Regions:
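Extracellular distal adhesion/interaction modules in secreted or cell-surface proteins
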Residues: 1-199
Length: 199
């Protein structure tokens, strides 16, 4: 396999970043589309714009940001997209049908960078009607842990509903096994046709 030697963006560069969350605790299909958000950090303005893009779970999912002012609940993912938690939004078809929603901007102080601070965004999942029956979905905080969320530089085409990420991105399992190998850093550059959502 030829190495992908695309330049790796600086973590404080003004560019979009995508976080894709997967509820691995319950009914995991490993499509990494249960909640998809886009971040646009602007270090000069010390702000990060947050956009909600997709909801591929029928559980109630609350987007949180643990920033300089403490933990903020930014809203329920389906409701932010104008839908209900009983439906999939922008995951069943090959092209999005619901417009993305810019939630707003959160404080992003100097010293924050995506590589170390994207994990400040996480999903709280509420099970049924029990307000205390919740799980958290976060980016891995150390190597070797089962990924519950992926951080991708730039715009990302997430797998369609029920499509395993391995079927959409064939290099992904190699990257997941050893993310230090340059050969696999561009795993998200060549999705399998028909298996992903475009916009």
């Amino acid at each position: 396999m030829e190495p992908d030697l695309q330049p790796i963006p600086e973590s404080d560069e003004v560019m979009p970043w995508t976080i894709a969350f997967e509820d691995v605790a319950r009914n995991a299909d490993f499509d990494f589309n249960d909640a998809v958000i886009k971040l646009m950090p602007d270090p000069k303005k010390e702000l990060c714009t947050v956009t909600v893009m997709a909801a591929g779970s029928k559980a109630r999912m609350y987007l949180h940001y643990d920033g300089p002012d403490g933990d903020q609940n930014l809203g329920e993912i389906h409701e932010l997209l104008g839908g209900k938690s009983t439906e999939f939004i922008n995951t069943p078809m090959s092209i999005v049908s619901t417009p993305f929603v810019e939630v707003g901007s959160v404080k992003w102080p100097k010293g924050y960078n995506v590589a170390t601070d994207a994990g400040r965004f996480y999903i709280e999942i509420q099970r049924g009607t029990c307000e205390e029956c919740t799980d958290m979905i976060t980016l891995a905080d150390s190597p070797g842990k089962m990924p519950q969320a992926l951080l991708v530089a730039g715009e990302w085409k997430w797998p369609k509903e029920g499509t395993h990420i391995f079927s959409t991105y064939h290099i992904f399992p190699y990257w997941a096994k050893d993310a230090t190998k340059v050969n696999y850093w561009g795993w998200y550059g060549s999705p399998t046709s028909g298996n992903y959502v475009t916009y």
